[in-house]
């Protein structure tokens, strides 16, 4: 899937991946997609909750080569 911006949040512990994603999403316009790459094991649950609370859409959450990849569409 195509994305408009990418955030490398590898090696960052909670809550930094969420905080950086929030900042990155603020720079996008409605409908644009942010790709986040993280390694924090709690990130899937954190991003699910973050999107639920903010109204952004978690398009996908996958594991690739020991990394977690999230695609989030800005509301």
Role assignments for model-derived ranges:
Residues 12-57:
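Amphipathic, hydrophobic secondary-structure cores in small proteins
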Residues 6-8, 42, 69:
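Intrinsically disordered, low-complexity regions of eukaryotic proteins
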Residues 48-75:
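C-terminal structural segments of small proteins and small subunits
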Residues 3-10, 37:
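Short amphipathic
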Residues 4, 31-35, 67-69:
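Intrinsic-disorder/low-complexity, polar/charged segments enriched in Ser/Thr/Lys/Arg/Asp/Glu/Gln
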């Amino acid at each position: 899937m195509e994305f408009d911006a990418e955030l490398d949040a590898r090696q960052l512990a909670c809550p930094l991946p969420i905080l950086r994603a929030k900042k990155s999403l603020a720079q996008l316009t409605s409908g644009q997609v942010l790709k986040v790459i993280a390694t924090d094991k709690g990130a899937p649950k954190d991003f699910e909750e973050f999107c639920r609370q903010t109204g952004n859409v978690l398009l996908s959450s996958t594991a690739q080569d020991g990394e977690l990849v999230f695609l989030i569409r800005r509301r």
